């Protein structure tokens, strides 16, 4: 089972991306939101689920573990396969999906192509009590991964700009300790500013 893929983004299409890892190009199906965060030629990491059928092996990729877990949870509902689960996550982001299921919001769920009123009712009945548990465990795991991923990206960017790895790591750790919620771009600018003062 392939749990995640990390490498250079070779291609981005409407419904998938190709990511090269260890010389192999993996085609990973993903939602528009996930694909929108990728950039051709840049490194990316996606959490993946592999669906194996008699005639195919398909990878589905997600930017966080919460989306990945919701994708798996959706497929426990009778009549929901990988395509419909992906369509659901394409229309409803994790928070909106959790709310719709918890509150029994059939209108929100039926906005997904392929989900009618009966299907939406079935989803609510089967998932209402399970969806919060997924969010709690996935949220905790996701935070740790995102934090380390941001750190790695900043250190690599600073190394690419010619800073020694030790200095890059110290500056990055200092910035993230002071502003743990900072985005990658903000943290990178702060680290560059810090390194500029010490040069």
Curated annotation (Swiss-Prot):
It comes from the Bacteria. GO terms for biological process: DNA recombination; DNA repair. InterPro entries: DNA_helicase_Holl-junc_RuvA_I (IPR013849), NA-bd_OB-fold (IPR012340), RuvA (IPR000085), RuvA_2-like (IPR010994), RuvA_C (IPR011114), RuvA_C_sf (IPR036267). Residues 64-141 are annotated as: Domain II. GO terms for cellular component: cytoplasm; Holliday junction helicase complex; Holliday junction resolvase complex. Keywords: Cytoplasm, DNA damage, DNA recombination, DNA repair, DNA-binding. The keyword RNA-binding does not apply. Pfam families: HHH_5 (PF14520), RuvA_C (PF07499), RuvA_N (PF01330). Residues 146-199 are annotated as: Domain III. Residues 141-145 are annotated as: Flexible linker. It is found in: Cytoplasm. Residues 1-63 are annotated as: Domain I. Signal peptide: none annotated. One of its GO terms (molecular function) is ATP binding. HAMAP family: DNA_HJ_migration_RuvA. NCBIfam families: ruvA. Homotetramer. Forms an RuvA(8)-RuvB(12)-Holliday junction (HJ) complex. HJ DNA is sandwiched between 2 RuvA tetramers; dsDNA enters through RuvA and exits via RuvB. An RuvB hexamer assembles on each DNA strand where it exits the tetramer. Each RuvB hexamer is contacted by two RuvA subunits (via domain III) on 2 adjacent RuvB subunits; this complex drives branch migration. In the full resolvosome a probable DNA-RuvA(4)-RuvB(12)-RuvC(2) complex forms which resolves the HJ. Has three domains with a flexible linker between the domains II and III and assumes an 'L' shape. Domain III is highly mobile and contacts RuvB. The RuvA-RuvB-RuvC complex processes Holliday junction (HJ) DNA during genetic recombination and DNA repair, while the RuvA-RuvB complex plays an important role in the rescue of blocked DNA replication forks via replication fork reversal (RFR). RuvA specifically binds to HJ cruciform DNA, conferring on it an open structure. The RuvB hexamer acts as an ATP-dependent pump, pulling dsDNA into and through the RuvAB complex. HJ branch migration allows RuvC to scan DNA until it finds its consensus sequence, where it cleaves and resolves the cruciform DNA. Belongs to the RuvA family. This is Holliday junction branch migration complex subunit RuvA. It comes from Rhodococcus erythropolis (strain PR4 / NBRC 100887).
């Amino acid at each position: 089972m392939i749990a995640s893929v990390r490498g250079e983004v070779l291609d981005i299409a409407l419904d998938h991306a190709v990511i090269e890892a260890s010389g192999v190009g993996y085609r990973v199906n993903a939602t528009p939101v996930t694909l929108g965060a990728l950039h051709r030629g840049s490194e990316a990491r996606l959490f993946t689920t592999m669906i194996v059928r008699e005639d195919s092996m398909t990878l589905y990729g997600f930017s966080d573990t919460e989306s990945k877990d919701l994708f798996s949870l959706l497929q426990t509902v009778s009549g929901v396969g990988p395509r419909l689960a992906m369509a659901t996550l394409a229309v409803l982001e994790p928070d909106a999906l959790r709310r719709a299921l918890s509150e029994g919001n059939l209108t929100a769920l039926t906005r997904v192509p392929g989900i009618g009123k009966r299907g939406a009712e079935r989803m609510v009945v089967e998932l209402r009590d399970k969806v919060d548990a997924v969010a709690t465990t996935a949220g905790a795991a996701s935070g740790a991964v995102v934090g380390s991923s941001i750190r790695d990206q900043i250190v690599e960017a600073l190394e690419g700009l010619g800073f020694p790895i030790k200095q890059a790591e110290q500056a990055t750790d200092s910035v993230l300790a002071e502003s743990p919620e900072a985005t990658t771009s903000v943290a990178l600018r702060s680290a560059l500013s810090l390194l500029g003062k010490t040069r």
